[in-house]
Amino acid sequence: MEFSVKSGSPEKQRSACIVVGVFEPRRLSPIAEQLDKISDGYISALLRRGELEGKVGQTLLLHHVPNVLSERILLIGCGKERELDERQYKQVVQKTINTLNDTGSMEAVCFLTELHVKGRNTYWKVRQAVETAKETLYTFDQLKSNKVEARRPLRKMVFNVPTRRELTSGERAIQHGLAIAAGIKAAKDLGNMPPNICNAGYLASQARQLADNYAGAVTTRVIGEQQMKELGMNAYLAVGQGSQNESLMSVIEYKGNPNPDARPIVLVGKGLTFDAGGISLKPGEGMDEMKYDMCGAASVYGVMRMAAELRLPLNIVGVLAGCENMPGGRAYRPGDILTTMSGQTVEVLNTDAEGRLVLCDVLTYVERFEPELVVDVATLTGACVIALGHHLTGLMANHNPLASELLNAAEQAGDRAWRLPLGEEFQEQLDSNFADMANIGGRPGGAITAACFLARFTRKYNWAHLDIAGTAWRSGKAKGATGRPVAMLSQFLLNRAGLNGEE
């Protein structure tokens, strides 16, 4: 799908369709008023007859409006004018895209980007429209024998901006939006891939392909079990013992900083390509969704793709911690004591608390990069889902400025997060009679104690932890990976690169 921006009046648009907003109660937006004037009151007469109230998401498709050059006009309800916020704006764009795609409008000029959204500029409105459009049209049908396609799908969207001086901002927004959307799609595709295809080896192949696609900027190294053993990554190795698939850690390095020796930002993604729970076997119901336990790694992959596509002036390392947690004769057991790469020992009380065992060794491994900061992303705890539901990613950090940066990026991107505490008072829940710590801390504050466990391996750098257990995928009829938090982390990196779109 193609996107572009232009600045022009609606009466001069010769297009398959013009998209304009209508507010409650039956109030035309300024652009709709211009079209109404051209058509001698045709549109306002329809509204007076009750054809459209203006509630968020309502649509009315008009054909051959008098004196209008375009074939059709799509009126889209935007709710109350003063209440149009980020969430409603994205809902309106989503409804617009679906309607255009379903009604055979192969190209359209969209004036929704001229609407006033509280606290948001043209760059934000155009970028969010691009990202939302790509999200709306996303399908995962690679493994279906019969693919359903729209007869006349939407192919081209032109976003109108109020003035010519905003064209540059709009073009930059499209560039950024397309790169972020591609990163989100890559993460969703990996997440949706079945575990008989997407194992640690598949993740490694995708990481290598990324290096091939962006040769000169991206390099990939894959570390196998033998090298992990030599490094002392015994906790990581233990988790994969029950699987016939080898555990593989894919290290993707992107160097975009003019100073190649600049300290990198490190992103670590939990990549449990299937989590049966090991000996502490999960219930059978819903176990199929444990293919999504690698969505942390998938999101890191998507962010690395975005950074390479935009050639961000940063040095970034992305680690995909690929592994599979299965029961079997070689599987690790409750009661085992593991010596981690850091030298600290862990008593395994539950083999289904495996993500932290993989991550703790990776968080020790990345010390060698002397990172400016480290962010890990993991579908880590059901407790985070109970605390924050499926709307907010859990954020914990040992560095307040880093936490603030991430929360700000989350709000900018519309990929929201909520900070949870990381207090020392929670650490005692991890006490063990037989090792330095246990791998679980009981039910109270489970998301926090999981992060407290990881914090014991991150004392040498500024670190944040994103628990995406509630936000990485949807269940039910809309089942599928969400691609979160690619948008948040992409915004974080754009901000770091000074490319945040502020005017």
Swiss-Prot record:
Transmembrane intervals: none
GO molecular function: manganese ion binding; metalloaminopeptidase activity
Localization terms from the record: Cytoplasm
Signal sequence, start to end: none
Binding site for Mn(2+) 1: D275, D352, E354
Gene3D superfamilies found in the cross-reference section: Leucine Aminopeptidase, subunit E, domain 1, Zn peptidases
EC number: 3.4.11.1, 3.4.11.10
Keywords tagged on the record: Aminopeptidase, Cytoplasm, Hydrolase, Manganese, Metal-binding, Protease
Cofactor(s) the protein requires to work: Mn(2+)
Cofactor, how bound (note): Binds 2 manganese ions per subunit.
Presence of keyword Transmembrane helix: no
KW Cytoplasm (keyword) present: yes
SUPFAM superfamilies linked to this entry: Macro domain-like, Zn-dependent exopeptidases
GO BP field: proteolysis
GO cellular component annotations of the record: cytoplasm
Sequence positions that bind Mn(2+) 2: K270, D275, D293, E354
Reactions accelerated catalytically: Release of an N-terminal amino acid, Xaa-|-Yaa-, in which Xaa is preferably Leu, but may be other amino acids including Pro although not Arg or Lys, and Yaa may be Pro. Amino acid amides and methyl esters are also readily hydrolyzed, but rates on arylamides are exceedingly low; Release of an N-terminal amino acid, preferentially leucine, but not glutamic or aspartic acids
Active site: K282, R356
Role: Presumably involved in the processing and regular turnover of intracellular proteins. Catalyzes the removal of unsubstituted N-terminal amino acids from various peptides.
Entry-linked PANTHER family: CYTOSOL AMINOPEPTIDASE, LEUCINE AMINOPEPTIDASE-RELATED
Similarity section: Belongs to the peptidase M17 family.
Protein name: Probable cytosol aminopeptidase
